[in-house]
Amino acid sequence: RKNNVRVGLDIGSTTIKCVVLDEHDALLYSTYERHYSHILEKAQELLRRIDAEQLHGQKALLSISGSAGMGLADSCGVPFVQEVFSTRVAVKRFVPATDCVIELGGEDAKILFLTNGTEVRMNGSCAGGTGAFIDQMATLLKMGADEMNKAAENAQRTYTIASRCGVFAKSD
């Protein structure tokens, strides 16, 4: 029997994300971890864990995406999928009514408009409002990003912060 388990590895500037899907697109496993610039070591560790805990030695299809994934994909002979394309395919398959996707990376922010084709807008020249900025705010507040997210869910008031640059927002 042909195995159609697929592993998607997204390697960004600060984190590595992974999903394992079965032949029916059911999610078998997912993780979101920091790589602390040890991309190769973290990818190896993660793939070994997936093999041991999910695949149990069975073969799977692997694709890599992300801003830091191309070099690894090339060196390993693994297909590289551009991250905006992979996001569009996943959203179309799993949440087809979606019109707009906002993706905050470690060092950039992207907005994908999906109606009538795909339009992409990107803030790649400033880390304000990206994952790195959110991490800095969490550190200043002495909480993790997950804790910050939970606190935001229960917020009773919204505070205005600087809209011109993330650097100035730190003092607000």
Task: Specify the residue positions occupied by each region the protein language model found.
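Alpha-helix C-terminal capping segments
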Residues: 74, 91-97, 113-116, 140-142
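Short beta-strand-loop/turn "lid" adjacent to the catalytic site in phosphate-handling enzymes
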Residues: 23-25, 32-35, 53-85, 112-120
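Gly/Thr-rich phosphate-binding beta-strand-loop-beta motif of the actin/hexokinase/Hsp70
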Residues: 1-24, 98-115
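N-terminal cofactor/phosphate-binding cores enriched in small/glycine residues
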Residues: 13-22, 43-53, 59-71, 91, ...
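Active-site cofactor/substrate anionic-group-binding motifs, chiefly glycine-
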Residues: 83-94, 98-102
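Short glycine-rich, Thr/Ser-proximal phosphate-binding strand/loop in the N-terminal lobe
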Residues: 8-49, 124
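A mobile "lid/hinge" subdomain adjacent to the ATP/sugar-phosphate binding pocket shared
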Residues: 148-172
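Glycine-rich phosphate-binding loop plus the immediately following alpha-helix
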Residues: 38-39, 116-157
